[in-house]
Amino acid sequence: SEVSNIVFDNTRTTSFSLTKKVSAPVDAKTDFTFKVAWKDKNGKGLKELDRIQVTGATVSNKNANGATVKVSLATGEKEKKITFTGIPVGAQITITENGKSGWSQVNPPKDSKYLLTISENASENAVTVTNSYSASGPWTPDVTKKLVAGGRTLKDKEFNFVIKDQAGSTVMTGTNDKNGKVTFVTADGEKRNSISYTEPGTFTYTIEEVKPATEEKGMSYSDVKYTVTVTVTDPKKDGKLKVTSAYVSNKESGNKTAAEFVNTYTAEGTWKPTVSKELTGGASYDSNGFTYSVKDSARKVVSTGLNKENGAITFTDIKYTQKDIGKKYTYTIEETNKTRSDITYDDTVFTVSVKIVDKGNGVVGADENSVVYKKAETVVTEPKFENKYKASGSATITGTKKLENQTLTAGAFTFGLFYDKDGKDPVKDASGEAITTTNKAARTADGKGEFVLNTPEYTQADMGKEFVYWVREIPGTDTHYTYDANGNISSIL
């Protein structure tokens, strides 16, 4: 028989090594994985995989093009050598380490790919991959500012804080925003918002509020000091340090997860309306002769006022505190004690609205731009009460009646008031009736009986005028008397 096409494959094989090193012994079992790619000298995958053996590592996904290799360093180890046998001479090996958090290669080749052409001399077929470990973790202080101040709210950057280390050196400074959150920056010039750690350990700090050189009146500053213990650990060895913190106040026991500084603000102040009085009719102002009241929405009197001689009205102060900051109040203003009959009083009820604001340094008061006076629904810029003076009065004319030869009895005789001597033009009252009167009974002392006549009411228009009246006895019908027909009494105003 004839045999043809017999091929003898005498490809020589050898080995190569992969040494895994770390810069310091690991303190716990640590795994590293590599992708090992292989090709023969012609660039094709390796066929006889059974020849390839790996010692010192766990192999997975082995195929014609390569395999995945896991290298495990035990606690305290810092290097391990893995050997690959049954590798054809001339094979091309590419080793790529899979990235591991926290670990970085020391002086890696380009693209971090280790290339190896297998030579017959196994000692020349060696690759060493060295890694170093680094980890970091931040601590961001958790601090809030609370202001107990009624309607007064926090202002941006109103309060300052400092964080010091155990040596008393300032490591961070901070200030608040209007919502109370305190943001810190490092004092090293980089102004980072957190302190970064690269090694496990325990760190102690203090946090306190910095009182300003000039303290605001009405503000009580916090004297609380927090001691913060920051604990840094590396439980997962993944490059990410675990950072925890506990806050302890010097004012209370127990750990807290954050620090809170509480300040209080107290303030007080007053406001009063500006209103005037106008009195027409020729009369002069009597100081304190007119009274006024200011009432709140519940109709409670909160202020009273009196006029001055120039017509200005002085009100008592309405008091406010920090609890009133930001609130808007509406009051009514009206004239009271309307008792004089010669005055026509103003029935107007003014309303005034005012917003109370913080003036700073413990003082509150009205926002003058918010003060609005209204009469009914109409805005007025100068609220004024207008009163009218109406003068009136009458003169009283008195006389006596003497009766000869008989005792005078009350009402026996009638007397009238006249504009003329002849008694033809009687003086009449407001109802149009002639003004008359009768005598009283005779006095014991002189036997005379008094009578009284009142003139008509005078008004302010009559001031300075002169009025002449005649008083006459009006004859009666009793024939036993002889009546006096002479009128001889006058009244001058």
Kindly label every feature range from the protein language model:
Residues 1-493:
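Solvent-exposed loop/turn and edge beta-strand elements of beta-rich ligand-binding domains
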